[in-house]
Amino acid sequence: MSLRESIAKNITEVLGDMDPPRPVFVTREPFDVEKLALTQFPALLIVTANETREEHTMGGNRRAVLEILINGFVRSDGREGFVQSVDEKRNEMIERVEETLNEDRTRELADSTAVKTRVTNIEVIQDRKPPLGEFVVTCEVHYTFTTTTT
């Protein structure tokens, strides 16, 4: 399995197992958020994005920075009274995602060394109409690995 895949799987598993409030639906397969059942919120879509690589040492060691996009979707039930707003639910889920990623920044990689995982950007998507809310958390995983020569 590639290191990109190992990192993406680890992040998907970790976010699926995080402490409450936790997402109900965590996947790497794109989906139509409009077709999710009320019971499938909050939902997260994990996507591997850009990666930069550079030589680290002459012995075939390289450094890489992999971007992971965590697309989050929340839903307010729209009732009056003591119910969280879309903004409150979105902020709470963003905080839980960041806290969970910070619990183990190494991503438990066997074939390389993950130097660090860090959140670099949080974007609130304004195009969603209530009761839906959307955000994208961008995180970077910095790691080193050894290339094989043939």
What are these regions (language model features)?
Residues 1-40, 48-150:
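Charged, amphipathic alpha-helical segments and their flanking helix caps
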